[in-house]
Amino acid sequence: MESGAVLLESKSSPFNLLHEMHELRLLGHLCDVTVSVEYQGVRKDFMAHKAVLAATSKFFKEVFLNEKSVDGTRTNVYLNEVQVADFASFLEFVYTAKVQVEEDRVQRMLEVAEKLKCLDLSETCFQLKKQMLESVLLELQNFSESQEVEVSSGSQVSAAPAPRASVATDGPHPSGLTDSLDYPGERASNGMSSDLPPKKSKDKLDKKKEVVKPPYPKIRRASGRLAGRKVFVEIPKKKYTRRLREQQKTAEGDVGDYRCPQDQSPDRVGTEMEQVSKNEGCQAGAELEELSKKAGPEEEEEEEEEDEEGEKKKSNFKCSICEKAFLYEKSFLKHSKHRHGVATEVVYRCDTCGQTFANRCNLKSHQRHVHSSERHFPCELCGKKFKRKKDVKRHVLQVHEGGGERHRCGQCGKGLSSKTALRLHERTHTGDRPYGCTECGARFSQPSALKTHMRIHTGEKPFVCDECGARFTQNHMLIYHKRCHTGERPFMCETCGKSFASKEYLKHHNRIHTGSKPFKCEVCFRTFAQRNSLYQHIKVHTGERPYCCDQCGKQFTQLNALQRHRRIHTGERPFMCNACGRTFTDKSTLRRHTSIHDKNTPWKSFLVIVDGSPKNDDGHKTEQPDEEYVSSKLSDKLLSFAENGHFHNLAAVQDTVPTMQENSSADTACKADDSVVSQDTLLATTISELSELTPQTDSMPTQLHSLSNME
């Protein structure tokens, strides 16, 4: 005998299943997907289960089914258009079938449900919004009904209940909202006794004109607008009560023109009452008047202040034909076009750059973001500030999240973060430079480069150093300059370990090790490692010598050469050898001189800067040797030369005396025994050197005198 099949069904199993899955998610157990939600710089990661998300959201189902799964790896999903709090509520609803949110977030949750294609959450939000809207409409009904009851009780009109068919002229009513409502005003108008005297009927009709119409038409229109899911219904604010009250008085004045003749039938009176009831201004005014009665004295004072401010604002837009004032420009333009047939053409132009826009909103946005340097939106990860929120979003996506989708260059394959960056990069291949300077004709591929270039002509230097007040045209130049004060050298050469203040200096230095000389002279085909060296070399071919000495008129191609030359006239010798005490006008001469003492020791170990003890190249102050020791040492050497008559053993004299002053050395002179120099020239050179050393010793006059006697 076969046994019948039975159904085993648990009503608590679905609830228990959701509860257990929720507990597993909170503990992070068995989670196989991480959802990263980022909105306006705020980011948070949520761990969840693929099966739960795919079962409740078609969006996640499509993502998980289309991905290429790899065993043992967790899937990462990025959402950029959902707020963190909203997605957290979405997850709670998915795992518990319920979530508690604020009333103003219901619309946002509905949008999240539509984006993620979660039908259960979408239906729940829609039903809740429907209930909220019905409650608002019910409150409006109660206001109207209570007012009509008060008015009808004061009119003292005997009326019988009217059948429902008498109000069928207004059309069908929304189901569930007004079917069960019965308005006293309607019964009074349609159920009026026919045996009343004509005069009494007219008096009662005048009283009935003050009664507002039943809110059937307004509720019908409201319900039609509420058919969409993204419609908000709000009770009118109390600050507009006075303005609409004036509209009500105007509407009542129009209604007062309707007078019922004495011989008019009651049916005719009822028809006219229906026409009176169609005046929407009366109903709106009555409802708002009821609301205004509940407002306190403080709110009335605020109303008056706001109305006064509104009257002041109205003067901004005034029609020149009918002298009517408007609060908004859009209303003024619409009035001029439809009432007077004047199509006013308004041009929204930026006063700074002259660019035109379609509307005032776009113009204000342009002025706020383009011509303003204020940056109110910081990145929470690195602190960098931006002018707009969407700039923060793009920055986080490109910099902190790996750049997202990369736009590849078709020629070199370089990946760019955006289409704009790709378009600017492609100009490096095409050579396109659409932005030209109106002053000198120089052209640039980017508008920012042109803006920076124009500062050369205008003299603008907006970036100022806080330490010394130096000004620069670009921000990165100021950053490099500040490292002179701090001593920071963050860029180190991996080959020799030398550090530099900027990446550009390190780039030039690396060419020493690589031997790269990318800059080539088109005249003699000589190559250089730095562009500036090429510019200086070109002056050899052109004959240009822009730097001129103001004392002797000699010209130079480089500024540092002129500075070294000026020391000949001033007698300045700031660089001294600490081994022999000899001074020099430039470091290069000292470097060659130090090879006499020790070729294996670095030449900087001999360097002593005697003029004001500035910092040397290593950033440390160098101690000066004792002045008396240096003076006595030099004096002894010079006297020994004078007494022994070894002037003929000095180094060969060059073409000019100043050159000999820099290069002559007593130690090297002893090796040049074969050099034959005239006695007069050598004596003049020695006297010149001694005259320059006079400030360093008090015994120089005696030495000069002895030398003169020897001559």
Curated annotation (Swiss-Prot):
It is found in: Cytoplasm; Nucleus, Nucleoplasm; Nucleus, Nucleolus. Expressed in adult brain, heart, skeletal muscle, kidney and liver. Also detected in fetal brain and kidney, and at lower levels in fetal lung and liver. Residues 298-309 have a biased composition (Acidic residues). CDD domains: BTB_POZ_ZBTB23_GZF1. One of its GO terms (molecular function) is sequence-specific DNA binding. Changing K50D: Decreased repression activity. Residues 31-103 form the BTB domain. Changing A97V: Found in a renal cell carcinoma sample; somatic mutation. A zinc finger (C2H2-type) spans 317-340, 348-371, 377-400, 407-429, 435-457, 463-485, 491-513, 519-541, 547-569, 575-597. The modification Phosphoserine is found at S613. Keywords: Cytoplasm, Disease variant, DNA-binding, Dwarfism, Metal-binding, Nucleus, Phosphoprotein, Repeat, Repressor, Transcription, Transcription regulation, Zinc, Zinc-finger. It comes from the Eukaryota. InterPro entries: BTB/POZ_dom (IPR000210), SKP1/BTB/POZ_sf (IPR011333), Znf_C2H2_sf (IPR036236), Znf_C2H2_type (IPR013087). Induction: By GDNF. Residues 197-212, 243-252, 265-277 have a biased composition (Basic and acidic residues). GO terms for biological process: branching involved in ureteric bud morphogenesis; negative regulation of DNA-templated transcription; negative regulation of transcription by RNA polymerase II; regulation of DNA-templated transcription. Residues 153-168 have a biased composition (Low complexity). Transcriptional repressor that binds the GZF1 responsive element (GRE) (consensus: 5'-TGCGCN[TG][CA]TATA-3'). May be regulating VSX2/HOX10 expression. Interacts with NCL. It is linked to Joint laxity, short stature, and myopia: An autosomal recessive disease characterized by generalized joint laxity, joint dislocation, pectus carinatum, short stature, and severe myopia with retinal detachment. Belongs to the krueppel C2H2-type zinc-finger protein family. This is GDNF-inducible zinc finger protein 1. It comes from Homo sapiens (Human). The gene is GZF1.
